[in-house]
Amino acid sequence: MAIHLYKTSTPSTRNGAVDSQVKSNPRNHLIYGQHRCGKGRNARGIITAGHRGGGHKRLYRKIDFRRNEKNIYGRIVTIEYDPNRNAYICLIHYGDGEKKYILHPRGAIIGDTIVSGTEVPIKMGNALPLTDMPLGTAIHNIEITLGKGGQLARAAGAVAKLIAKEGKSATLKLPSGEVRLISKNCSATVGQVGNVGVNQKNLGRAGSKCWLGKRPVVRGVVMNPVDHPHGGGEGRAPIGRKKPATPWGFPALGRRSRKRKKYSDNLILRRRTK
């Protein structure tokens, strides 16, 4: 991804750093309307995820995370922008006439061929079971449950590493630093997700942030006591507590939020790094 800087003519262009224009011309049979209800609210209308709301209307692209076109070669026809994720997507034309979207692997260009199945070449964009991959392979779009489709390492620039195979399980190091076990029969895609430089973008202005459905973030210390535990006081005052808290009074900054006694606790060999 190429980062473009504009000539300074307004405060927006002075601070902005955007990626190169990747156009989107989605196929009608691969999109559907998505009713984005809630905007961070639960069924009772109470805010459970803050700083969300507004945003431009979106059409959802149907992404093939299963890669179940076995041993049928496909060709990359387009590389497109997807408003629902920070990774790009590419349209694949398969030999049997099927047309599907997949996540764009880093380095893939229009005209490249891909295939999924067992005993296929270890090549960027190919999907195959973990049992057929050599140790040290960089992978993304990894299944957790066999046949359910890829669920891990799908964000822009995400990549995991196959570090061991023993018995019925394979050991993976995930982008978060977590090391966990997954069935060797689960599938994954070779390579890294594209659009690696997405974290170098600078939107440059608040309006661009609003288009993405992200609202302003207000510090609790400048609120009233009725709105936040940190609020209140005369002028610029400290939070008045030994430790910071969430708007609902629970401990913040460091408290573990993972549920106890989860089924996958035995599969995690090392917790993610902060």
UniProtKB/Swiss-Prot annotation:
InterPro entries: NA-bd_OB-fold, Rib_uL2_dom2, Ribosomal_uL2, Ribosomal_uL2_bac/org-type, Ribosomal_uL2_C, Ribosomal_uL2_CS, Ribosomal_uL2_dom3, Ribosomal_uL2_RNA-bd_dom
An example Gene Ontology CC term for this record: chloroplast
Cysteine disulfide links: none
Keyword hit for Plastid: yes
Domain of life, source organism: Eukaryota
Compartment(s): Plastid, Chloroplast
Keyword Ribosomal protein: yes
One Pfam family it belongs to: Ribosomal_L2_C
Keywords from the named record: Chloroplast, Plastid, Ribonucleoprotein, Ribosomal protein
An example Gene Ontology molecular-function term: structural constituent of ribosome
Family the UniProt entry places it in: Belongs to the universal ribosomal protein uL2 family.
Oligomeric and partner information: Part of the 50S ribosomal subunit.
NCBIfam families xref list: rplB_bact
Protein name listed in UniProt: Large ribosomal subunit protein uL2cz
Organism expressing this protein natively: Glycine max (Soybean)
